[in-house]
Amino acid sequence: MKSSAIFFVCIVVATFTAQAFDIKDDTKICGVCSQPVHVKIAISIQTVGSRDLDLRPAPELRDTLKYQIQYCPKCGYCWPDIAKERKREKIDHILNQPIQYDDIAALFARAAAIEIADNAPSFASFMLFLKAAWVCDDLKNKRKSDDYRRLASHQMDLYMERDAIARTTGDNYLTQVDVVRRIGDIDKARRLLAIADLYAKESILPLILAFQKKLVENKDTGRYTVADVLTLQQ
């Protein structure tokens, strides 16, 4: 994944206006059971500000998490776009597990499990677990957000093991550094930073690398943005 792209990895359809985002009702056909599913989609989103170092976007886009996952109450399938087709036999064991439709973090986690079962550990499964963590951040549930960050980090490990391009992409390491630093896994953050030194060469990545090194050495587990890198490094 190119470094110029990863800064915008979570972007959904956005229109830059002065208005708050709108919600559109829609009906889609479930990609597993072929039944109609009523969904709500966030549109006309204005994003102003700097993204977090773990890729979470600035407001208003950061406030649309519950509209970034869709759930079929008929079969239990969930995915960012419920119309994505999948073979039920590969994910049936996941769909049969009980889940609360309004537990947004659990829906993201189920989508990650579906991706792993249907394909393999990937950047998508990493991001889905990370979004589950963001939901728990907003709910002030530190224990659950830490659990989901650990799962996200493990997915990135597995993804980079199987993908040669992914494991030589500097921003993958820097994103994962932020994920593990936030949960206080300083040892793993240091190991990742040592590898990131080899690959974090493009654009703003060297600045983020230096910033993360300071945070890790200070055992700082706080949330920071790209803007913080540019201002606090000066």
Language model segments and positions:
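TPR/TPR-like (Sel1-like) alpha-helical repeat modules
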Residues: I186-E202
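Alpha-helical linker/edge segments of TPR/alpha-solenoid repeat scaffolds
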Residues: T175-K188, K213-Q234
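Bacterial N-terminal signal peptides
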Residues: F7-T15
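Boundary/linker segments of alpha-helical solenoid repeat arrays
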Residues: Y159-T169, L198-K213
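Alpha-helical junction/boundary sensor with strong preference for TPR arrays
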Residues: I114-D118, C136, Q155-D163, Y199-K201
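N-terminal cysteine/histidine-rich coordination modules
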Residues: A18-H93
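Amphipathic alpha-helical repeat scaffolds of TPR domains
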Residues: K84-Q97, A105-K140, R167-R182
